[in-house]
Amino acid sequence: MGLPLRSLEELGAQLSFYGRSLAWTGRTLRRYKKEILRLLAEVSFGRGALAVVGGTVGVIAFLSFFTGTEVGLQGYAALNQLGTSNFVAFLSAYFNTREIAPLVAGLALSATVGAGFTAQLGAMRISEETDALEVMGVPSLPFLVTTRMIAGFVAVIPLYVVGLLSSYFAARTITTGYYGQSAGTYDHYFQQYLPPVDVLWSFGKVIVFAVVIILVHCYYGYYASGGPAGVGVAVGRAVRTSIVAINLLDFFLSLAIWGANTTVRIAG
């Protein structure tokens, strides 16, 4: 079988896996509430070394803070050359909300929660724990995959609130504290160029990212093979696939939401 056919077969297997995982959502919510709650805590605050930095919430907050700082630094420096430094708040309201914060949140989820899920499911597959669940009459797909998808779906909303506010705070702090721009001027333009609907769409993008990331990572972990080395290979493949998926989704979602019209008008 040639490479194109193998790739098509792999894509079909993945889509079938995603569909079956989503189809189990209703029954999983009824049957496995305790497991979902346990995973919620793990997704938000992490375990082991990840818990030291505050879990996923800490990673997203730190990454968003520093990207927001860069938006403030570079935005002010560039606009100041044109005599329009007052509009640096527009950059924060526009780019952080629509593109930067959602992408940062997606990458953070992939690197922390997603990679962890792949390793967990891969280890369970290698040690035959997944098969043991089936022998005991527990469907492994909803118990291992759908529960994680639901936990990620619920957890990503407060996580993203922290990340988005962190990026806003960083851009404002660097602009008003370091460059000395009036806080009133910054807040005026920030509020003028931040329509609430953009924030809602931003949350919508992140929710889609979270579901896709977790499904991709769970797929590679669920079907891992080849011993401990195979788990490492599965994690690498999952991270690469999820990063590509995030960027493709970001492009098409942004095109669908803001491609034909815009909620922000600078002139005219």
What residue ranges belong to the model's regions?
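Hydrophobic alpha-helical transmembrane segments of multi-pass membrane transport proteins
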Residues: 85-131, 216
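Membrane-interface helix starts
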Residues: 27-37, 41-56, 243
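Membrane-helix cytosolic exit motif
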Residues: 221, 244, 248-264
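Selective transmembrane-helix segments that form parts of the transport pathway or gating/packing helices
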Residues: 48, 52, 100, 104, ...
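Short, membrane-interfacial amphipathic segments enriched in basic
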Residues: 1-38, 220-225
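Membrane-interfacial helix-loop-helix connectors in multipass membrane proteins
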Residues: 67-97, 162-207, 216-235, 260-268
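Hydrophobic alpha-helical transmembrane segments of multi-pass membrane transport/permease proteins
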Residues: 50-69, 249-252
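Short cytoplasmic-facing helical segments at TM-TM junctions of multi-pass membrane proteins
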Residues: 121-146, 228-231
